[in-house]
A protein has these predicted regions:
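Membrane-integral, polyisoprenol-dependent glycosyltransferases
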Residues: 1-208
Length: 208
């Protein structure tokens, strides 16, 4: 069982990396949204304003800064902002979300089920496209999915302590795309707990 699990895990890791990472810089920005996000990271690096940078002389970003921080981090390593470094946060998020899904289901079902789930995630058209784009959606989705996995683990263990890792993921999602990063994972977990006949007000208290 362990050998099969380890082989499947390495297969998913290698497959996810090979499918995503080498191809990020092969095409120019092809939507108005991609350069709009990249220029925010460029402005952060150029002017040192990491909270509310001013773009093109007067425009301010209308999305929270976490995604742009990620672009700026990778671009700082590379030396400049380009298509590859701008798309890398999305690709890394998809790789980590795929691996996280595999590990989550392997512990609760079996290796075969988790392998199928991971491959379906990685090859789903919209998910793959989001992972190849310089947009906030993939980073936001990966953090929310991670939060839901961690909230489920917290429920499994009896809800004794605060789910700090889930809170950290939801904080990152909120810093990526706003309050939906908290609202959606808590709503999904709240509905799940209701299906398990948990006390309604107890759920509200724990999710608040």
């Amino acid at each position: 069982m362990n050998i099969k699990y380890n082989k499947a895990l390495w297969l998913i890791i290698i497959l996810a990396i090979v499918m995503m990472i080498p191809f990020l810089g092969l095409s120019d920005f092809n939507t108005k949204g991609e350069p709009r996000e990249a220029v925010v990271a460029y402005t952060m690096l150029e002017h040192g304003n990491w909270i509310l940078p001013i773009n093109n002389g007067g425009d301010i970003p209308y999305k929270p800064p976490f995604f742009h921080w990620c672009i700026a981090f990778f671009s700082l390593i590379a030396g400049h902002v380009n298509e590859y470094t701008s798309r890398l946060p999305s690709a890394v998020s998809l790789v980590l979300m795929t691996i996280g899904g595999f590990v989550f289901y392997a512990k609760r079902k079996n290796t075969q089920t988790s392998l199928i789930a991971a491959i379906l995630t990685l090859t789903a058209f919209e998910v793959h496209r989001a992972g190849m784009n310089c947009r906030v959606d993939m980073v936001n989705s990966a953090l929310m999915v991670g939060a839901m996995y961690l909230l489920y683990r917290w429920w499994e263990k009896g809800k004794h302590q605060l789910p700090w890792l889930a809170i950290l993921c939801m904080s990152g999602a909120t810093l990526t795309k706003g309050p939906v990063g908290i609202i959606l994972p808590c709503f999904v977990m709240g509905v799940f707990m209701l299906t398990q006949r948990e006390n309604f007000w107890g759920i509200v208290w724990r999710m608040a």
